[in-house]
């Protein structure tokens, strides 16, 4: 065996040792009920096979036919074992769908059933120390939940919203991501400094969280389009907020924030897309809504790898937990708007960022809406500005609220200063 081959084999042995060390982890056990799967990992000429069954991880015979084959290209192992691993190397799903030097083969539904276990396994094997950040003062008791009725084009819709902060101050409205709800912004809604400066809003969109389907719903598959989504947002801004607001949506919420800025700028005084996509293709898969897959396990795991490995584990768990509770088909249908319909190349030039201030926030560990995507959007909106967050992922407000707070403060200060020349940091 050559020196190079020996080095690869040694690195693979380190990775496999870490994966085996996760055997018996209580969370892994919770995420793998009924699972029995063989995983093969190849790098160069080295190969290892692991048997994963209901929380147990054991070596399997090298000659076994694996259910899932994972092939790591040159240099991938070294990056995976860095502390912290760089973007696109931080977890199983990041490696599978975002890393061009990795291939994963296996039955699609079998892979979907194993995703929760595999994501947790690789999360533990590639763990990094938590990144410290100044603690923010929060008062969750200051957040008030309300039930309201929106008069929308499709008829009246009862929704749940949360409101906090200084009544009558500049409105700051947070919009949640696909398949989730306003719990993602719990830390920002309770933030004392934000509440002193802004009137804070965080609604659950219809069919999400505590916003129930209308009684007139016939049970047909839920669908989301730009027109329907914008109608909901416009109704909330006009009927609940009642004056121009700063709109701060994340992911699909960022996409509709840009749509609103393009088509209804009179309702806004500032545009703050968090993790905005350019064209986020390939986000839909069968495991999100198939009777052969536990969608709660799958969908929570599918988003887990989008976060930074240095974000606090407890917050990352909460972010995934929200996704585990979505109604059947809602996440996948939301992605129909986010991943199939929304086109930043079409929408961004319609936003007049020279008159309406626009600041984009992009996390480096986000492979669904990357910093490069944000830069493309900025280039199409002269006057827009972008802040890159090198140590955060797709759910910055949820995965590490204290670290995100500084970036949010910076973005809000730029919005308050008015439109500006393009700048990227």
Please tell me what each predicted stretch does.
Residues 1-145:
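Feature captures hydrophobic
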Residues 113-116, 122-172, 195-198, 243, ...:
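Alpha/beta-hydrolase fold catalytic core
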Residues 199-248, 406:
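Active-site loop/oxyanion-hole signature of alpha/beta-hydrolase fold enzymes
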Residues 384-425:
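Catalytic active-site module of serine/aspartate enzymes centered on a nucleophile-bearing elbow/loop
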């Amino acid at each position: 065996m050559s020196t190079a081959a020996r080095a690869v084999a040694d690195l693979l042995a380190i990775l496999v040792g870490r994966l085996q060390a996760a055997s018996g982890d209580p969370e892994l056990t919770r995420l793998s009920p009924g699972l029995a799967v063989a995983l093969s990992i190849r790098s160069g000429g080295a190969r290892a096979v692991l048997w994963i069954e209901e929380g147990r991880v054991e070596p399997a015979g090298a000659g076994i036919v694996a259910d899932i084959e994972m092939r790591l290209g040159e240099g991938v192992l070294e990056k995976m074992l860095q502390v912290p691993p760089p973007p696109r190397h931080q977890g199983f799903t990041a490696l599978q769908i975002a890393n061009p030097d990795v291939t994963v083969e296996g039955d699609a539904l079998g892979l979907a059933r194993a995703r929760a276990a595999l994501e947790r396994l690789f999360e533990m094997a590639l763990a990094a120390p938590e990144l410290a950040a100044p603690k923010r003062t929060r008062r969750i008791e200051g957040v008030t939940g309300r039930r309201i009725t929106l008069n929308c084009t499709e008829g009246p819709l009862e929704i749940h919203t949360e409101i906090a902060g200084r009544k009558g101050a500049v409105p700051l409205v947070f919009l949640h991501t696909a398949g989730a709800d306003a719990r993602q912004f719990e830390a920002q809604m309770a933030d004392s400094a934000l509440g002193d400066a802004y009137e804070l809003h965080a609604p659950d969109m219809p069919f999400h969280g505590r916003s129930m389907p209308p009684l007139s719903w016939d049970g047909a598959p839920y669908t989301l389009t730009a027109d329907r989504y914008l109608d909901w947002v416009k109704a909330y801004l006009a009927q609940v907020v009642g004056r121009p607001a700063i709109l701060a949506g994340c992911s699909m919420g960022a996409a509709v924030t840009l749509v609103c800025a393009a088509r209804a700028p009179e309702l806004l005084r500032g545009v703050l897309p968090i993790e905005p996509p350019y064209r986020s293709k390939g986000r839909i898969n069968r495991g999100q809504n198939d009777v052969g897959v536990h969608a709660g396990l799958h969908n929570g795991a599918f988003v887990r790898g989008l976060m930074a490995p240095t974000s606090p584990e407890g917050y990352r768990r909460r972010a995934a937990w929200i996704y585990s509770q979505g109604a059947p088909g809602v996440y996948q249908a939301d992605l129909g708007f986010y991943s199939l319909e929304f086109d930043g190349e079409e929408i961004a030039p319609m936003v007049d960022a020279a008159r309406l201030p626009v600041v984009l926030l992009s996390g480096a560990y986000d492979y669904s809406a990357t910093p490069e995507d944000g830069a493309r959007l900025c280039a199409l909106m002269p006057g827009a500005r972008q802040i890159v967050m090198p140590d955060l992922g797709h759910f910055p407000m949820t995965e590490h609220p204290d670290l995100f707070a500084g970036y949010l403060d910076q973005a809000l200060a730029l919005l308050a200063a008015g439109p500006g020349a393009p700048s990227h940091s």
